[in-house]
Amino acid sequence: MLVTWEATRACALACRHCRAEAVPFRDPRELSAAEARGLMDEAASFGKPGVIFIITGGDCFERPDLAELAAYGSGLGLHVALSPSGTDKLTKAALAELQDAGVNVISLSLDGATAATHDAFRGIEKTFDRTIAGWRAARELGMRVQINSVVARHNVHELPDIAALVRDNGAMTWSGFLLVPTGRGVDLGSLDAREVEDVLNAFYDMGEAVPVRTTEGHHFRRVSLQRHVLAGRGVTGEAMIETMHLGTLYR
């Protein structure tokens, strides 16, 4: 079982898609440390195998009690993971402290293959550089890293280059998040049905080089099965493209 706790709305970024509509300062209605421990107690009561307990936000590093809570959850047998933002708080020292508290897995967001694309989406300059630096620091510490990429019109043509970054820097998983138009994301450009088919087929191809999964793209499993069957029948290349009715975005 997986439990995701949005521990705070506070975040230094201004991401264009943020469903939490994060703000620079913490909300007084956030769970206190005692309430957070109670939440972890409840999650731990679910039994074995231990729950994967993801602490996110906002930016989870905005909570000064983050390491304390991570250690508490780890002590209960929870598999505590973090999903921090690419800010100046994402340092090797901070990651090492969390690793000492029992955190061995983090997820980071990479929404462009270049600083220009990623930073424009995240609303703050240097976010791309900080994310790459945090990614490499986590890997140097021996932590496992999942890379999450929102898939929308702003970056769809950069997906192959993002895949190359995942391949070169190493990650346990690359997850493509098909844009959910909620929060600040209601006005962003979602892909249409034909374009989604093209993207999911591209993810299938890129999965030969990097470990790929999707979020809010449940039909990726259907595409994977179709492609597996076609490959078994020797249907590849242009014949596959025609059979799957793929469009210009895939090409």
Please tell me what each predicted stretch does:
Residues 26, 79, 99-101, 109-111, ...:
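Radical SAM enzyme [4Fe-4S]-AdoMet core and its adjacent flexible, acidic
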Residues 1-101:
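Conserved alpha-helical substructure of the radical SAM core
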Residues 16-17, 105, 173:
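A short hydrophobic/small-residue beta-strand
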